[in-house]
UniProtKB/Swiss-Prot annotation:
Transmembrane segments: none annotated. Keywords: Antibiotic, Antimicrobial, Defensin, Disulfide bond, Secreted, Signal. Disulfide bonds join C30-C59, C37-C52, C45-C60. GO terms for biological process: defense response to bacterium. It comes from Mus musculus. This is Beta-defensin 33. One of its GO terms (cellular component) is extracellular region. It is found in: Secreted. The keyword Signal applies.
Length: 62
């Protein structure tokens, strides 16, 4: 019974790790498009159509 419980816990942990990797992969396009995530108060940068992790930042062209 304990072995079954430990296997279940391991399965839950692995599922959370893979979902975390998928969540972070959608934020990579900013770097792939040649940009960097900066705060919204930054002036003088052209905004790229990519996502950043923080909702208070946008992707700026370097």
């Amino acid at each position: 019974m304990r072995l079954l419980f430990l296997l279940f816990i391991l399965l839950v942990c692995l599922a959370q790790t893979t979902s975390g990797r998928k969540r972070n992969s959608k934020f990579r396009p900013c770097e792939k498009m040649g940009g960097i995530c900066k705060s919204q108060k930054t002036h003088g940068c052209s905004i790229l159509p990519a996502e950043c992790k923080s909702r208070y930042k946008h992707c700026c062209r370097l």
